[in-house]
Amino acid sequence: MGFIDDELQEVSKLCHNVVEGSRLVSCVRTMVRVEITKTKFKTIIVCIQFSEDYPRTPLLIELKSKTLSVKLLDGLAEVCEKECKKFLGKAQVLQILKFVRNFIDENPLICCYDEISTIKKTLENEDELKLKQKYSCIGLKVQRGLYYFKAKIEVPDNYPTACVKLEDADTNFPPLFRRYFLAQGKELARKCVEPPLKKKSQAPFTPSPSLNTVTSFLVKSVKTLPQEHCQSCRQMCLPPNPENAETNENADMHIERLYCGHLFHLHCLVTYMKTPPFHGGKKCPTCKQRIYHEKWGLTDKLAEARWAHQQARARELAETQEIYSVQHSITDNEEDIVVSFIFCI
């Protein structure tokens, strides 16, 4: 038997034991085909052909996958061919299979390669995106002016079947927005992997990647919130310096976020909710969606009744003051008449 036949025999005997998660599909002179699997979404099919002058020349390698990025696979195939040159004159097949398996183990973020590429395009110069392959997480920092939000995004091993998680969050936005970033990010991630309670269609639910969904939300929020205006007074909600932002959640100038996403000062929101029109519920001046807020639980009928009562009270006070003014004027006139009469005597 020749060199290639000996190597093929060695591959067929040792592949399963030497390369973890491998399945030998074919092992003949025309092609060696091996499927290497760590998870359902981290599977690479290695297709190997022998060159004419093998083993004096490197193997011809093609990588395939149903879930991983084509661009990633093309780049890895080039690296594999360079790796083959280290073993010229020797058996190369098992060495390359072990190299591919090692690449999968050491780069757990390969399952979100395309998402990471998309995220990088949305970031600006002051933003940061750091890949930490060893810990299967991404360090994200988004900034607008002096405001920032940074967090560690953990990517689970069975991603995208399981969703990403936000950890170690830090920001200089007021506490209200920190809670919003984390809660909404968690909810968006959950929706990507859990079916809705009320299905709109009969189609089976399929989990979708959550990294880009969560990150895009965080980037958009941090970039736009410092430039938002109060929907009532139209003044900037957040001051240019985060240190001057109101953090007392009962203060008049504290920022309140509606479910539609628009912002109000607390004082402006209360004033707006207490004044007509009330029919059909109070609506956001910008998007016309009905306003729901945890600090305002009155129905439109009760709010209208209270407003009418306040107006009636105001009219009563005005009438009382007017009567008092008339009586006071009459008394003053009577005193003037008495004084004039005395002087005349």
Functional labels for PLM-detected ranges:
Residues 224-304:
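RING-type zinc-finger domain of E3 ubiquitin ligases
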Residues 41, 53-57, 69-71, 148-150, ...:
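Eukaryotic short linear interaction motifs
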Residues 137-158:
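Extended serine/threonine-enriched, polar tracts that run as long, contiguous segments within proteins
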Residues 50-52, 155-157, 275:
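Short, low-complexity Ser/Thr-rich regulatory SLiMs
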Residues 302-345:
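PEST-like intrinsically disordered, low-complexity C-terminal regions enriched in Ser/Thr/Pro
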Residues 1-34, 54-140, 159-229:
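Glycine-centered motif in EGF-like
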Residues 6, 27-29, 41-43, 56, ...:
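Eukaryote-biased feature marking scaffold/signaling PDZ-domain proteins and nuclear chromatin regulators
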